[in-house]
Amino acid sequence: MSGERRLNGLSLKVGPLGEHDRLLTLLSDQEGVTRLAVPGARRPRSSLAAAVPLSLLELQVAGRRGLARVRQLKVLRSFNSVGKQLETLAAAQALAELSLMLVAGNDPLPGLLNTLLMHLERLEALSQAQPAQPNTTLACSVQACVHLLALGGYGLPVQECCRNGTALEPPLGQWEWRCSLMPEEGFAIGALPGAALQLNPSELALLQRLLRPDLPMRRDGELMGPPEVWLRLLAVVECWTRTHLPHHMRALGMLRKAIISSGDGRT
C-alpha cells in the first residue's frame, strides 16, 4: 500500500471510530500531530488493542491521503500508571491537551515531544509516591505548562514589565509590592485596574524560576512554596492559556479540583 512509513510518538488521545476501530491522535517529531485509524483495535484480542492514551508507540502506518491506517503497533513505554492518583492523571491529561493545542496540524514543534515525555516521567514517579505528594504534583504541572507554552511560542513574559519595559525584579521582603497580570499583555509593575490577578514578590520570583529545568527546592530538599501559592500560579497559567490559546483547557480545572479535594490545597 502506498505511503508506508514508520512513526514513533506519544498517543495524546484515543477515541472510538466506527464499531470496531479506534481513532488515534499521535504526537511525533516527524509529523507533529497525526490522526490515524487503528482498524480492529476495539475487538477482543486484537494485536492493535494497545493503542491507548499516554503510550509511546512505534507504528507502521499506511496511506497518506485521507485517514492513514496503522498496520503494526509496538508499545515502547506506557505512562498508564499516572492513573493511580487523580492528581497525576489530571496533570497528565492537561499536558496532553496543551500539547495538542500547541501543534498546528502536521507542522512539528522541535523539542515538544521530548519535553512532554520528561514531565510525564516526573508525574509517573509522583503517582507511585507514598504518601501522595499533591503539592509537588501541582508544582510539576505548572512548571510543565510553563515549559510547553514557551516551546509553543506562548511563553509567559515574566522578565519585563509589559507597560514600560522595566525589568521585573521582585523586591523580596517588600510585601506591599505587586505586579499585575494583564491577560492580553503580560505582567505590569503595580496593582493595576483590569488585572486578572496580582502577584507579590515571592510569587513572581517563584514563577520566574519555573523557566529552569528543575523545580525550585529549598536547601533542606523540600519544595518551595505552599499549596495556596502554587494554586495561584496555576491560576496564572489558566488565565494565560484561556486568553491566548484557541480552546479552554478543561483538564486544568480538573487538576485544580483534584488538588483541593486532596486537602493539600486551599481556596
UniProtKB/Swiss-Prot annotation:
KW Ligase (keyword) present? no
Q: Which Gene3D superfamilies match?
A: Nucleic acid-binding proteins, Recombination protein O, C-terminal domain
A family per Pfam? RecO_N
Provide one Gene Ontology cellular component: bacterial nucleoid
Q: Among its keywords, does the record have DNA repair? A: yes
Which keywords does the record carry?
A: DNA damage, DNA recombination, DNA repair
| UniProt-listed GO biological process terms | DNA recombination; double-strand break repair
Q: Which InterPro entries match?
A: ARFGAP/RecO, DNA_rep/recomb_RecO_N, NA-bd_OB-fold, RecO, RecO_C
Q: Which family does it belong to?
A: Belongs to the RecO family.
Q: What does this protein do?
A: Involved in DNA repair and RecF pathway recombination.
UniProt name for this protein: DNA repair protein RecO
Q: Which organism is it from?
A: Prochlorococcus marinus (strain MIT 9313)
Lineage of producing organism? Bacteria, Bacillati, Cyanobacteriota, Cyanophyceae, Synechococcales
